[in-house]
Curated annotation (Swiss-Prot):
This is Small ribosomal subunit protein mS41. One of its GO terms (cellular component) is ribosome. Residues 1-20 form a transit peptide. Keywords: Mitochondrion, Ribonucleoprotein, Ribosomal protein, Transit peptide. It comes from Candida albicans (strain SC5314 / ATCC MYA-2876). Component of the mitochondrial ribosome (mitoribosome), a dedicated translation machinery responsible for the synthesis of mitochondrial genome-encoded proteins, including at least some of the essential transmembrane subunits of the mitochondrial respiratory chain. The mitoribosomes are attached to the mitochondrial inner membrane and translation products are cotranslationally integrated into the membrane. mS41 is involved in telomere length regulation. It is found in: Mitochondrion. Pfam families: SAM_Ribosomal_mS41. The gene is FYV4. Component of the mitochondrial small ribosomal subunit (mt-SSU). The keyword Ribosomal protein applies.
Length: 170
């Protein structure tokens, strides 16, 4: 019964060939290149329009003042010479006695300055909350435990004072 119903339905459907203009515009598979190439077009960077750019900084004092973080204290190590600062390597800065955090900061700004990537400004140091990410849970737990202990001692002191006044009879 089902076969006859199905076969009669199939016979009644007339399939018509569909012609499309798309089939003529699609390239054949053999014409697609198998090797992908990198773009050789120049990358368009945002133009730096600030006054704190490479063209406006001519001495090391100005540079160190603009980048902030008390970098001006290293001015004497470079003899206040911008070219000496720009040619100094990380190993030489380490031998001069510049600590790691400040050295990395100076090197990062030197790279940005030479390539004119960003206006000179101070990148503020982040502030740790609750002792930093790794110790946050223990610091919060200790703080809450101390608060509970202080609250318990305060309550015990209030009860003792109330008992001395005669407000509590035990």
């Amino acid at each position: 019964m089902f076969r006859t119903l199905l076969s009669s339905t199939v016979r009644s459907i007339q399939l018509k060939p569909v012609t499309s203009t798309l089939s003529t515009t699609i390239p054949s598979i053999t014409s697609i290149p198998t090797v992908s190439y990198f773009s050789t077009s120049p990358i368009n960077y945002k133009t730096n329009t600030s006054t704190r750019t490479k063209e406006n900084v001519h001495d090391l004092t100005t540079f160190l003042t603009l980048i902030g973080r008390n970098s001006i204290e290293y001015k004497d190590l470079f003899e206040d010479d911008l070219n000496k600062f720009l040619s100094t390597t990380s190993a030489q800065m380490k031998n001069m006695g510049i600590d790691t955090r400040a050295r990395r900061y100076l090197l990062r700004w030197r790279h940005k300055f030479l390539n004119d990537l960003e206006p000179l400004r101070e990148h503020k140091l982040g502030k740790k909350r609750n002792g930093g990410e790794r110790k946050a849970k223990t610091v919060i737990a200790k703080r809450q435990a101390l608060e509970r202990l202080e609250e318990k001692e305060k309550w015990a002191q209030e009860e003792l004072e109330a008992e001395k006044r005669g407000e509590r009879l035990f």
